[in-house]
Design a protein with these regions (language model features):
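Long, low-hydrophobicity, acidic/polar, solvent-exposed interaction domains
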Residues: 1-85
Length: 85
């Protein structure tokens, strides 16, 4: 499908996948790996978008991005939401 897979990172560092079966479910890095690997197997050209809260630590985003790359995600985007003043 042409819809990107969205990985949300909250400012607390918790990670969520925006897919119907996992909505609102906090994932460990292992769970993230398993789920994303399955989706990439089904669709190797899947675009993955990391959506980080404005206050999320940059290192956390980099860790997730590196994980996605190691799983074979080729097309990774990044959206950051600015914290509200």
């Amino acid at each position: 499908s042409s819809e990107p897979l969205i990985v949300s990172i909250k400012d607390t560092g918790s990670v969520y996948l925006e897919v119907e079966s996992l909505l609102g479910q906090e994932l460990s890095l292992d769970q993230l790996n398993q789920n994303v690997s399955k989706l990439l197997d089904a669709d190797p050209s899947l675009q993955v978008v990391i959506r980080g809260d404005g206050r999320v630590e940059y290192e956390k985003v980099m860790v997730i991005m590196a994980q996605l790359q190691s799983m074979g995600a080729k097309d990774i985007g990044l959206i950051t939401k600015e914290p509200l003043q």
